[in-house]
Amino acid sequence: VATSVHPQAQMLLDGKAAAGAPPLWELSPDEARAGVDANAAIIPAGPELESVRDIVIPSQAGGMPARVYSPSASAPGLVVYYHGGGWVVGSLDGWDSSVRALAVASGCDVVSVDYRIAPEHVFPAAADDAYDALVWAASDAGLAG
């Protein structure tokens, strides 16, 4: 089990502590989302790709927003990406830079899923959305390419 934090991550944590930022878990969902969005806004843009397009994936709850990142016209596969945020924070835009980097590093198309988040949507909404996206990817992956 790792007991240390990467130096770059530690710099971020130290900077937040020095600025008096409370830990994420002490914030309301709205406060946490605002903080995460503010952090995302200062992250440099990710690499340029062949194409980036917004789509809607069919789901049990209707349509689920998603974004397809294609590093090339002939990507060999598809990665389904579920953003971080403990099922409470996070968005397509907030993870855009990371997903672009993943698409380039993997050489694969990546579909980033904007699943429903809590507390507005109770369990198992996010898990259902994640499953629906995976089923869609397995059956319609050609659509994403």
Annotate each PLM feature.
Residues S74-A75, V89-G94:
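Conserved AMP-binding/adenylate-forming
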Residues Y115-I117:
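Active-site loop/turn elements of alpha/beta-hydrolase fold enzymes
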Residues H121-G142:
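Alpha/beta-hydrolase active-site loop
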